[in-house]
Structures are given as C-alpha cells and as structure tokens.
C-alpha cells in the first residue's frame, strides 16, 4: 500500500470515528434472561425391561414388566364385509373353529313381463358360484355343507343395531332342514379351490333334498300355475329393478354352514379340515330352468337362468334394499385354553385371526412404579419418551437370533400373521359394549397411507418377532403413574385396578391388524416375564425405552 493510499484510508477512519464520537451505546445482555432456566440439566437415557430385569446404564433391578392372559371377545363385526367365511378346522393346539355365513340375495336379471319363467317351467339344477380369495388348511379335504333357507327377516326388522357380530345365532330365523347340500371341495365333480393369487369362479352343483322342490316352486311361481294360465309369472313384479325391498321380503336369503366333521387325515401338526373366504359380491346361487312350448308341452323351448346374487352393496349399486351378509364363527377351545380364558396368567399365549383368543398384556405394579420413579427422581423434572419399542417373540424364538433353529422356526413364520395390532379395548371388555375396538394411540392404522407410521407391528422374519413402537402409550402411562402417587411417592394402584379410573391405561390387547380382523393365520407367542408356578419364559416380551429428562 502506498503512503498516499494509507493516508486517505486513515482520514476516512478519522471521519467515521468523529461522526460517532457523540454517540454512546449500552448493550443490555440481561434481556430475556428470566426465560433461561437456571441450573438446567438435560440427559438422554435408555432403559430395557427384559426377562424380569430392568437395566439402565450400570444399574440393574429385578422388575417383572408384564403378565399375559388369554382373552376372547365375540363382539367382532362380521356383517357386510368384503368376504364371507365358511369351513371347519380341527387342531390339537387351537381346538376347533367352524364358520358359516348368512346372506340375503338379490335377483340378477329381470323376468319377462309376459311370460315370466315360461310356460309350465321345469326346474333343472341349482349351482353355487364361489369366488375363493383365501383359504387355510388342507384344501383337498372334503367337507359337507348345508344350504338353509332364511324364513324370517326379524333379525333385521326387530334389531336396533345394524351391525352383526361373529356370535350371531341364526337358529330362530332359518329352516330346520337344508334345502340343498353340497361337498366342497369336490375334485371328482370339478369343484376346486383355485389359485388365490388369480381367483376364478368355482361352480358347485347343489344336491337336492326333500325340501328343494317346494323352495324352487316359490322362486319360479309354480305353486299354483292354474291361476296364471300355466305360466310362471311374476305377478307382483318382485324381480323388477326398484322393487328390491319387496324381493327380500319374499326371497329372504340363505344360510350356508358345515354339516359334520371334515373328511381326510391329519397333517404333520395333527390338524385337519380347511376354511375358505369367498368374495361376497362375486358369489351367487344360480338357478337353471327350462320352459315349454304351449302348443306342444313335450318340447323344450328355452333355458332360463337366474342368478341370486349375495350381498350387493346399496352404495355401489344404488339398490333400494340394503341387504345383509353375516359370517358366524364358532370356537371350541382345547380344555387348557378354555379354563385359561379371562383366568390365570399363561407363559405361552395365542393370537387367532378369526375371532378366537387373543393376548391380554397387563403391566405389573412394579413396572408402573418404576415409570413413576423416573419422573419423581428429580424435583420439577420433565420427562419425554423419545422411543419405546415393545418386542413380542414367536414361540421358538430367542433373544439371540443365532440360537434360533431355522428348521423349526421357518414353519412357524410361514403360518404367522404378517402384522399384529395393539388395542386399548378389544370388543366387549369391562362395560360389555359390542365391537368396542379401540387401538392404542401409537397404532394409527389405515389400509392406504402416504406416510410411514412409526408403530410398525410387522413380523420380523430374521428375528422371529413383532416390534411395536408404543412411545405415546408409555408416555401416557408414565404421566398417569407419576400424577397419582402419595406423599411417599408410591403409586395409588387402586386407581389402576378393574373399575378404577385408570384401569385401561395398564392393559394392551395383542390381536390381528385392524384392517385384517378376519384372517386365517394364528400363532403362539411368548408371553410376559412374570413367574408362573416356578416357571418363566426363555424370551418373554421386552420393552426398550429411550427418554429425555430435564430439570
């Protein structure tokens, strides 16, 4: 830099300094300091409840986290679902489960105004058109079924509830004896299950019984042909679009259920039989009839085909009669499970995807106290649960995945549900209210979502477990525990007992995913870490909590 330039620069600095010479500026560094916590301390901690021990850092404490029981609710909605279910399975582990379905029907086409079914029509045959979308068990094992006529619609007209459940009993509304019978599957007669990845229609020929002809006569208006000049005429025009309400009063529908036990032998697990799901809107009963020439009744004129479609959505098809379909599921549990339902704690629990038993997980007093102690460990502390992972292990699994036997666990994994849900209420619990199914806060379920939900709940095949993020649930339980303590910091457990205001905060129901409450898969899961008759589980349910504490 030249001296001349340096001189100009110095002059400039002098001028700026002179301009501010008369100004004084005082900075107040205390502004807002009342909002800054004094002596603030923030720590991130991790604790694990595993096999009856709580570990946090170098600290270990014997704490049993949870117990498990078997629980069953019949209050699972089974009306107007996408599928209806039928079949019979027997298992030495899970007991028997049997399903049938009840459905109203609607005509598939309009009858001719002038000729109806034709002149002196003849009943030829009746088929059942199924659209199998899922199955479970031995699909080669034959099962006999009965088709019963619904004789009364009182179950709809006299009911204040438009929802029906798996325990619905159709006995008072159906005929005592079947109007048809059939065997399914029936390979000799061409009735196969098919490929569920590419479903197709499967037509089953129905076999007549003593009551078939009387039923068909009413469908075809042939009970008294003399009144209609020997034509099977629809004089009331119930087969006419717009008169669906009158139709379902006259043709009330069907109930299809297994007769007897499944045929065939047992598989390697000692199980026999099968269960099926058929898409209800793609299923129907189809009547084939023939009409004659009036001029020469010995000659067949036409073939008349009428389909009686199962449940048709009034929203989708804008029909004026909202008809109903209901699946009924019956369970006969093995004696061990029957005595354990709502009873004693179990080491190995179960989850059945078809209205069977599920697992009730109840957190222990000492676990709840340990959560309260976290909040009370520091004066005026604030605790935030960053993450809480609940791990539920399949039977045959282990904490050390290298110890899992691949040969045995693969079979178990293949039969397990792809996802499980956690619920604060599952059906008719303490109040006995039906279909009272409420997920825990973390389980935001939907069939389609544009976001990834942290709950997870999917089967981890590598570790043979289900992992659920229950951070909100644990946070709520922790706050409830800390807010309900006495002067000594002991939790007031009476509030968490049945009938108490906080009773529901300590219990979770492990059950099928919310969008798959009806499914055929079922499995045994390792239960809690509470000792039962001197025995404990090898890999009980674990909980890992990461939390931040600030004071």
Residue ranges and their predicted role:
Residues 2-9, 13-551:
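Secreted, disulfide-rich extracellular signaling modules
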């Amino acid at each position: 830099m030249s001296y001349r330039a340096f001189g100009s620069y110095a002059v400039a600095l002098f001028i700026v300094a002179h301009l501010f010479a008369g100004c004084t500026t005082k900075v107040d560094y205390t502004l807002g300091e009342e909002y800054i916590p004094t002596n603030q301390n923030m720590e991130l901690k991790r604790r694990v409840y595993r096999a009856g021990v709580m570990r946090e850092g170098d600290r270990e404490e014997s704490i049993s986290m949870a117990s498990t029981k078997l629980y069953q609710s019949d209050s699972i909605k089974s009306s107007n679902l996408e599928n209806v279910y039928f079949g019979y399975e027997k298992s030495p582990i899970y007991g028997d489960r049997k399903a049938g379905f009840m459905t109203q029907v609607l005509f598939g086409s309009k009858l001719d105004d002038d000729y109806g079914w034709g002149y002196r029509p003849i009943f030829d045959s009746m088929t059942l058109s199924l659209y199998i979308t899922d199955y479970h068990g031995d699909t080669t094992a034959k099962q006999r079924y009965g088709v019963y006529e619904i004789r009364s619609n009182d179950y709809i007209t006299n009911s204040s509830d438009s929802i029906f459940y798996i325990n619905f009993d159709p006995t008072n509304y159906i005929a005592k004896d079947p109007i048809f019978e059939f065997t399914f599957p029936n390979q000799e007669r061409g009735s196969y299950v098919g490929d569920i990845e590419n479903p197709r229609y499967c037509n089953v020929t129905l076999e007549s019984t003593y009551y078939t002809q009387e039923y068909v006569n009413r469908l075809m208006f042939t009970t008294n042909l003399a009144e209609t000049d020997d034509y099977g005429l629809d004089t009331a025009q119930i087969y006419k679009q717009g008169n669906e309400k009158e139709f379902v009063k006259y043709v009330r529908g069907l109930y299809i259920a297994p007769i007897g036990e499944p045929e065939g032998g047992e598989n390697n697990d000692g199980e026999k039989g099968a269960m099926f799901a058929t898409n209800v809107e793609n299923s129907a009963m189809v009547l084939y009839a023939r009409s004659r020439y009036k001029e020469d009744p010995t000659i067949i004129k036409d073939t008349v085909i009428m389909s009686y479609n199962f449940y048709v959505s009034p929203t989708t098809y804008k029909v004026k009669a909202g008809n109903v379909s209901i699946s009924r599921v019956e369970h006969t549990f093995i004696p061990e499970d029957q005595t354990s339902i709502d009873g004693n704690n179990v080491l190995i629990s179960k989850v059945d995807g078809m209205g069977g038993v599920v697992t009730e997980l109840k957190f222990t007093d000492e676990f709840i106290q340990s959560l309260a102690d976290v909040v009370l460990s520091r004066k005026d502390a604030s605790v935030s649960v960053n993450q809480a992972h609940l791990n539920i292990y399949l039977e045959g699994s282990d904490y050390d995945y290298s110890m899992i036997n691949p040969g045995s666990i693969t079979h178990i994994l293949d039969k397990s549900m792809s996802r499980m849900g956690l619920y604060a209420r599952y059906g008719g619990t303490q109040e006995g209210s039906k279909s009272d199914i409420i997920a825990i806060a973390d389980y935001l379920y939907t069939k389609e979502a544009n976001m990834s939900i942290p709950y997870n709940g999917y089967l981890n095949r590598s570790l043979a477990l289900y992992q659920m993020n229950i951070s909100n649930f644990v946070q709520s339980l922790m706050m409830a525990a800390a807010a309900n303590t006495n002067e000594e910091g002991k939790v007031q457990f009476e509030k968490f007992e049945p009938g108490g205001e906080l009773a529901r905060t300590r219990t979770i129901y492990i059950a099928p995913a919310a969008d798959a409450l009806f499914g055929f898969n079922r499995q045994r899961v390792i239960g809690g870490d509470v000792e039962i008759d001197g025995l404990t589980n090898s890999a009980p349910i674990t909980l890992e909590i990461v939390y931040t504490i600030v004071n």
